[in-house]
């Protein structure tokens, strides 16, 4: 897991590229990065979400020059009045340089890209039932009136029951078509893809 070891994964890859012969066992994060580099939009969103979850933006912004400004603007507009508490980054001592405003912005961006990721993953799951990943599609299992997630049909033995949602503020999720990207989300995805 070269890309699961904190900031600077690009430096490791640059060093490895100069070796004559290398034996690498790729990890799940490496596979996500390869999928993103190959143009898979769900992998791209997942890579960015993980970086935001751990406030590890160096590899994204500095290492690969991926422009996160469209995502930041979208997140600030969409979640302006949302504390995004469930999406605060998990930060270690090395991330102490982030001030409160930066942590809030990262939280907003994390929430925005998480919603986008789940929508993009749905298209893959729906197109490939042989993957047997339908239990990963969750937006259509939310009871918006009660604020619960219905997992009764997601396990082999009948399910895991109903669970209260910790966050119900998803303004870009259309309750009638929860996996559809809004035009603004589609724009963010395209800008990230082009970056």
Model-derived regions, located:
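Feature recognizes metal-dependent phosphohydrolase scaffolds
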Residues: 2-195
């Amino acid at each position: 897991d070269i890309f699961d070891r904190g900031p600077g994964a690009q430096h490791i890859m640059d060093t490895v590229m100069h070796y004559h012969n290398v034996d690498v066992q790729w990890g799940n994060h490496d596979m996500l990065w390869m999928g993103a580099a190959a143009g898979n939009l769900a992998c791209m969103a997942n890579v960015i979400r993980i970086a935001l979850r751990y406030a590890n933006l160096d590899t994204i912004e500095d290492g690969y020059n991926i422009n996160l400004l469209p995502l930041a603007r979208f997140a600030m507009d969409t979640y302006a009045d949302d504390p995004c508490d469930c999406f605060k980054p998990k930060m270690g001592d090395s991330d102490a340089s982030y001030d409160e405003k930066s942590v809030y912005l990262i939280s907003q961006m994390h929430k925005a890209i998480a919603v986008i990721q789940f929508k993009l993953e749905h298209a893959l799951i729906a197109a490939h039932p042989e993957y047997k990943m339908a239990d990963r599609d969750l937006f259509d299992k939310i009871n918006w009136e009660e604020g619960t997630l219905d997992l009764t049909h997601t396990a082999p033995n009948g399910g895991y029951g109903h669970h209260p949602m910790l966050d119900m503020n998803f303004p870009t999720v259309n309750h009638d078509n929860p996996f559809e990207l809004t035009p603004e989300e589609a724009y963010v995805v395209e800008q990230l893809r082009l970056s």
